[in-house]
Amino acid sequence: MNNLEFRVPKDEKEFNEYDLFRWRLLRKPIGKTIESLKDEYEDNSFHLIGVIDNQIVACGRLHFIDDSKAQIRYMAVDEEYQRRGLGTSMLAALESHAKDNNAEKIILNARDHAIKFYTAAKYKILEKYHGSDTGIPHTTMTKDI
């Protein structure tokens, strides 16, 4: 995967493709509309995509909760590209952006099937999270950076 590039979506067309990718992987399978992607942090978030051959294959979003704490949301890797290190690289890039902007801690709400992935990246379990609008069990995890 020598041609993998992580970047912020470069224009409106690519942002629309990014939204469609996020929705297709994370929200459509549970019956949510594409509009359900947008929350109060959307416009002030750091959005990152992983691109191979001009195709989005991974995504993640980071926003700041306060001056020292950031939250990662909407992390996903296309099934065809999973278990090749893209998720780990995406996570590292989001963490790096948080650290570069003075975050000391990152939190996230992991779907249960992703807990092992985040634990391997040194995230610690805090508690079960019950605030998700997805109906899917999540666990709040944290990491000092």
Language-model features: locations:
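Anionic, Ser/Thr-rich low-complexity intrinsically disordered regions
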Residues: 2-97, 101-121, 126-145
